[in-house]
Amino acid sequence: MKETIDFLIDTIEARQVLDSRGNPTVEAEVFLECGASGIAIVPSGASTGAHEAHELRDGGSKYMGKGVLSAVNKIHETISPALCGLSALDQTAVDKLMTEIDGTLNKSNLGANSILAVSLATARASANALDIPLYRYLGDPLSNLLPVPLMNVINGGAHAPNSLDFQEFMLVPHGVNNFSESLRMGTEIFHSLKSLLDQKGLSTAVGDEGGFAPNLSSSEEAGDLLLEAIQKAGFKPGEQVSLALDAASTEFYNDGIYKYEGKSLNSSEMISYLSRLVSNYPIVSIEDGLAEDDWEGWSELNKELGDKVQLVGDDLFVTNTERLRKGIMEKSANSILIKVNQIGTLTETLEAIELAKMSGFTSVISHRSGETEDTTIADLSVATRSGQIKTGSLSRSERIAKYNRLLKIEEELGNQARFAGALGLGPKNI
């Protein structure tokens, strides 16, 4: 074992780089006394919840105001001097010090993007110093569960310039024994879907997350296309491959009304609509079926559908333990979406996952629409045995990078590897 001093943080570098949408984001590199280092790049969302931690942006004319040099400077001028000399192995202390220096509830002083970049890079530096994979460093010897992928193959809403109000229509290939076969199934259906869209004269242009973005008349048309693509690829809907939705309902909600497909619906009417979809399609998961502050509606939704499908809170919970506790008390959902940049530190992310698990909620580890080549979430999904991951479609290399990382992890684990399959949708089975 190396001497403790070897794990002390020596220096931290940061720079402005680009994400998958061509927008600036923060990369941080943490160097330890022993010579090991770790790099992390933070993602950014398009449909962001009002309660998310604050990203620091420059404003002004450069990069249309989206530059992050101010966040980079915060790392160089404030975070690095404060953290140098701390043990990188004490992730909690590192993250706590950054949040204390920031001094705000939403990290608006230092910026969640600067804090998170350093937080994740610190963990990776520690793993590299110990010469172990990140999933093993963050997890334990039982961290061997590969997640079921929720593959966003039809994009709508804020993720695509088309007519669909719902943001994501996903494949859930669960009816196999390992991750690599699940990935193969999803890939074959993706190509089957592309062929179908071509045949129907529909666009095969892709959205932010690599899924197709055709102009369709309704969510039902999207669902029908997915069922046809699954069958055309030789698989059985519901038995081998199910469907999942991200309604991102906050995006079309205002003053108690959901403006959906040209109609004005109240919460009860929206719940009835979602219930019909569940009855007519093999849907196993609905994310953000209602708006982020429609707490009463969420409780009704959970009463109606909570014993039938996974109800995932994204904008509802924003990876925040306080909002999650409220949701647990009010029985508002049964699952939480985990996005590291919504809360801004690795420690708080792990706390949210643990609280969900203790409360009988599932957790779904997720990317953002503005992604990078960073593969931390792949390791995080295995480390925490979450059983599910959302990392986009089967195109765009920033999405594929996470799938490829999971393939490598499965190979490293060998016969110790387990695959969540259908079990990934129920925490009692993990």
From Swiss-Prot:
Its EC number is 4.2.1.11. GO terms for molecular function: magnesium ion binding; phosphopyruvate hydratase activity. Binds a second Mg(2+) ion via substrate during catalysis. GO terms for cellular component: cell surface; extracellular region; phosphopyruvate hydratase complex. (2R)-2-phosphoglycerate binds at residues 167, 339, 368-369, 390. The active site is at residues 209, 339. It catalyses: (2R)-2-phosphoglycerate = phosphoenolpyruvate + H2O. The keyword Flavoprotein does not apply. This is Enolase. It comes from Prochlorococcus marinus (strain MIT 9215). The lineage of its organism: Bacteria, Bacillati, Cyanobacteriota, Cyanophyceae, Synechococcales. The gene is eno.
